Amino acid sequence: MNLSLCIASPLLTKSSRPTALSAIHTASTSHGGQTNPTNLIIDTTKERIQKLFKNVEISVSSYDTAWVAMVPSPNSPKSPCFPECLNWLINNQLNDGSWGLVNHTHNHNHPLLKDSLSSTLACIVALKRWNVGEDQINKGLSFIESNLASATDKSQPSPIGFDIIFPGLLEYAKNLDINLLSKQTDFSLMLHKRELEQKRCHSNEIDGYLAYISEGLGNLYDWNMVKKYQMKNGSVFNSPSATAAAFINHQNPGCLNYLNSLLDKFGNAVPTVYPLDLYIRLSMVDTIERLGISHHFRVEIKNVLDETYRCWVERDEQIFMDVVTCALAFRLLRIHGYKVSPDQLAEITNELAFKDEYAALETYHASQILYQEDLSSGKQILKSADFLKGILSTDSNRLSKLIHKEVENALKFPINTGLERINTRRNIQLYNVDNTRILKTTYHSSNISNTYYLRLAVEDFYTCQSIYREELKGLERWVVQNKLDQLKFARQKTAYCYFSVAATLSSPELSDARISWAKNGILTTVVDDFFDIGGTIDELTNLIQCVEKWNVDVDKDCCSEHVRILFLALKDAICWIGDEAFKWQARDVTSHVIQTWLELMNSMLREAIWTRDAYVPTLNEYMENAYVSFALGPIVKPAIYFVGPKLSEEIVESSEYHNLFKLMSTQGRLLNDIHSFKREFKEGKLNAVALHLSNGESGKVEEEVVEEMMMMIKNKRKELMKLIFEENGSIVPRACKDAFWNMCHVLNFFYANDDGFTGNTILDTVKDIIYNPLVLVNENEEQR
């Protein structure tokens, strides 16, 4: 199938791009034809993102500033310790009488009414506490009275701890003689709900969570517990509101030192959490990687991860007192080859549980990269999946629209599976430039989400698409030039073969790797069909002999036109690889590529002879041959000569290199045999499922065998994942190991529903990667 013929007008020019792109940026104009507008946009945007790595910004919090404003002076308890915070509250009330995110584009819509209620009530209490701002108090009360029904509305999204914090503030307001026009029954109901929530936390032994929201408990909280959760900087979980409440109720000097340091840094208003630099920079790395633009920021990413690893080794509180940061740090460090254990993450999830959806979400992502030996200590980590499924099915109304979608996608598309470029496209299309986060109140950081990331990701995606289209055209010409399209017995899968590498080795500079991968993918498909149905045993043997001899007279040595076409195409591809790889490796690797092809064809010949002779091998005998005959060797092994690092003969012949290949190929063979069992059984072909049924325990049915084999695939995958991620003792460069890992993702994709190439459902996905424009679904939507 020629994909180009399936798509009308596939070549998208700059002018035919979707309007979404022009909405993101104003295109640069060239001067005298010397400046490429796209390159100028990319370079300028990269510079802006690089600056974001140096300066972390976070919005101030009306809610937390109000709690800091309530703190009395140690020397004069009837006076505020931080009068500048009171002045800030007076000067930053919103037009409708509420307090919330200041200078925020969506604030006027009150996407989180409960957040506005708790922030506004905290500000009213702070002002009343010191008898200032009477006009602001009255306007705030009017807002609360108009929206108080939302406090008990289960369909409204809730900040963390709202069911404890808001009733606590109501009680505090009542003690200050603040008269809210609310029904006594509603007030009693909220207090009762607070009591139930407190009991639930105690029964589940999540005292750390109660400490985090302790300002809502007042006299119900044992303030002596503060020391257990007090960090070295004097704060309670880096929360200004909890720390302020702790000082008000316990006069802990460390708490006051923390609050003073906050005001020294931020002036007259504070954020909802501080410090947050490490988490924000990790979020930047995560976002950049998800959007497919990490190749632009390799130095910045390494600097962030090196610093994070230093903090991990030193057991820095920024990591180990917060589930979200710990889970994110663990995942990014492990994926990038740093030696980290999940034990600390398991410990913190046991202590703090999942205080919000983001905590569960990040922990679930981390659970995807646990090794087999991690599973016993990571039971609490694995519970994150159940938590996410539970909130989707029973309590989805309290989730924001954005988080709800993130949870759905996390469960549907696990973070460590799937094809890189498919994930990138989906992440770009769903990206929200106004990703406001929710803790006890909402906050925003331009480091976490902004238009620069999206602008660069879109331009980069289209740049890559234009490269892919040209490479695919060249491959289609190569197929015709080598007469492979004339082999009627063979499947024509040029677009599929190219797609499999464009979706994984996506960077522009990896063009040689993509061409090598795709050419050999095309050839292995054709050769597989030749050994399967297109050739006689004599022809198969003749083809192998020609490759072994190499310098042959095709007119004399090839026994048929089919053999002639196949040999010349193989020689053309192998010689091209040898010539181009020399530029990367500074040595001739042609003999290794030839040997890889010979290993494949000999394994295929062995299977053909077994079939001819009606020989039934043992399962072990079959698998030792079948992982090679699955034909991934010629695709992956030559391609890794083009991904960057130099590969010595020692590396290529090492047991580590062989194990990488065997684990990858075994997974592929088992997936293929599971999905093609019924068809191959009818055709009388050898298959692992059939052999397992015939050689295994009596009475086993197909479903049981398939279940066992799927578990085997899962274990092989975890074993391979460990080989890929771990650097200690490894001699195969990471970029090369990633090629084996990427092929596993390709296999999972192709065998998700059908037995590899026999399904047509992937055609739309192929178009998405190579041809179709992006559709930015969040561009004109309100965030919540």
UniProtKB/Swiss-Prot annotation:
Is this entry keyworded Secreted?
no
Residues that coordinate or bind Mg(2+) 2: 528, 532
- Residues recorded as binding Mg(2+) 1, renumbered to this chain, are 528, 532
Which UniProt key words apply to this protein?
Answer: Chloroplast, Lyase, Magnesium, Metal-binding, Plastid, Transit peptide
Q: Where is this motif: DDXXD motif?
A: 528-532
Gene Ontology cellular-component annotations: chloroplast
Report the enzyme's class at the first EC level.
lyase
Molecular function via GO: ent-kaurene synthase activity; magnesium ion binding
Q: What is its main location?
A: plastid
Q: Where is the transit peptide?
A: 1-28
Lineage, top-rank taxon, reads Eukaryota
Cofactor: bound how, per the entry note? Binds 3 Mg(2+) ions per subunit.
The UniProt family comment states: Belongs to the terpene synthase family.
Q: What does this protein do?
A: Involved in the biosynthesis of ent-kaurene diterpenoids natural products such as oridonin, miltiradiene, eriocalyxin B and nezukol, known to exhibit antitumor, anti-inflammatory and antibacterial activities, and in the production of gibberellins phytohormones. Catalyzes the conversion of ent-copalyl diphosphate (ent-CPP) to ent-kaurene.
According to UniProt, the name of this protein is Ent-kaurene synthase 1, chloroplastic
What's the encoding gene here?
Answer: KS1-1
